[in-house]
């Protein structure tokens, strides 16, 4: 029987535990973890994500600040704002919501964030730590997936893990985290030949390709663990994943739903990394 990996329930559990840790930090050291989210423009999806992050941060006892900027802001002005929060000792996490308007260079903006406050884990210094096997700040979605696999006691050692999607946000860091757990990893993408054949050999299949219901049952072997990272809208505006849930769930041993799977855990790991950043500040 297929087991649903309930990311929403796990996120609630972890955020409840996090709220207690935040209160303990406040009582013992007088420090409240501070998170600032910088939103440029009025992308509707980004606005929803930012609201959810802000709500979760406040509920867990964080200091939460959202900076909403005009889409027309120039790159240098945005960098000045980032530098201000780099120096602000009450802020332990800085997140610039992506995507940014086309006139702003995302790579340059990521470089300007203090890597010790880069709770998205995108700064090259944090990428280097991850690839050298000494992760500090890890991209939140892969980190959340690893927590889910651990919670459901899914053993990765010696397993064949296939990732569909090679982004710097999910696919590439996910590959390294799985390698660190001694999985054998195949990283694929939209131009991979014989993709359905490769994915159907996976013990663990992680799908982050950004196409609604891309993965159907022929992509999945019997008993596989299927993690769906996708968030898409169908023709009726319904939120769907990259995996055709109904048909794939008939073959999978474990599967994440959309919504209620990976999404809530991404926010949870953002908060966890902000807390850890505050804790490192105390230690130093």
Curated annotation (Swiss-Prot):
EC number: 1.5.1.5, 3.5.4.9
Catalytic activity: (6R)-5,10-methylene-5,6,7,8-tetrahydrofolate + NADP(+) = (6R)-5,10-methenyltetrahydrofolate + NADPH; (6R)-5,10-methenyltetrahydrofolate + H2O = (6R)-10-formyltetrahydrofolate + H(+)
Matches recorded under SUPFAM superfamilies: Aminoacid dehydrogenase-like, N-terminal domain, NAD(P)-binding Rossmann-fold domains
Pfam families in the cross-refs: THF_DHG_CYH, THF_DHG_CYH_C
GO terms for MF: methenyltetrahydrofolate cyclohydrolase activity; methylenetetrahydrofolate dehydrogenase (NADP+) activity
Pathway per the UniProt entry: One-carbon metabolism; tetrahydrofolate interconversion
Any one of the GO BP annotations: L-histidine biosynthetic process
Keywords, sorted A to Z: Amino-acid biosynthesis, Histidine biosynthesis, Hydrolase, Methionine biosynthesis, Multifunctional enzyme, NADP, One-carbon metabolism, Oxidoreductase, Purine biosynthesis
Binding site for NADP(+): 165-167, 190
Keyword check for NADP: yes
Keyword Transcription: no
Cellular component terms (Gene Ontology): cytosol
Job description of the protein: Catalyzes the oxidation of 5,10-methylenetetrahydrofolate to 5,10-methenyltetrahydrofolate and then the hydrolysis of 5,10-methenyltetrahydrofolate to 10-formyltetrahydrofolate.
HAMAP family xref list: THF_DHG_CYH
Entry similarity comment: Belongs to the tetrahydrofolate dehydrogenase/cyclohydrolase family.
Subunit structure: Homodimer.
Stored NCBIfam families: PRK10792.1, PRK14179.1, PRK14186.1
UniProt protein name: Bifunctional protein FolD
Gene: folD
């Amino acid at each position: 029987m297929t087991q649903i990996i309930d990311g929403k329930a796990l996120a609630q559990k972890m955020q409840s535990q996090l709220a207690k840790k935040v209160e303990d930090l406040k009582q013992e050291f007088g420090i409240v973890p501070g998170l600032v989210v910088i939103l440029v423009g009025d992308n509707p999806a980004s606005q929803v994500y930012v609201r959810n992050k802000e709500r979760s941060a406040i509920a867990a006892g964080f200091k939460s600040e959202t900076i909403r900027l005009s889409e027309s802001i120039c790159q240098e002005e945005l960098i000045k704002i980032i530098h201000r929060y780099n120096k602000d000792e009450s802020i332990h996490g800085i997140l610039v919501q992506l995507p940014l308007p086309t006139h702003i260079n995302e790579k340059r903006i990521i470089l300007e964030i203090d890597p010790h406050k880069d709770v998205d884990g995108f700064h090259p210094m944090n990428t280097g730590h991850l690839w050298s096997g000494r992760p500090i700040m890890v991209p939140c979605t892969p980190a959340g997936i690893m927590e889910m696999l651990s919670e459901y006691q899914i053993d990765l050692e010696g397993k064949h893990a296939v990732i569909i999607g090679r982004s710097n946000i999910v696919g590439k860091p996910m590959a390294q985290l799985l390698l660190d757990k001694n999985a054998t990893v195949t990283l694929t993408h939209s131009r991979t030949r014989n993709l359905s054949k490769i994915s159907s050999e996976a013990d663990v299949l992680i799908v982050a390709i950004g196409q609604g219901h891309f993965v159907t049952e022929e992509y999945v072997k019997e008993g596989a663990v299927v993690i769906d990272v996708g968030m898409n809208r169908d023709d009726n505006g319904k939120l769907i994943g990259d995996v055709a849930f109904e048909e794939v769930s008939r073959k999978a041993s474990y599967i994440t739903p959309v919504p209620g799977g990976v999404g809530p855990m991404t926010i949870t790991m953002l908060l966890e990394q902000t807390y850890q950043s505050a804790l490192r500040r105390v230690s130093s």
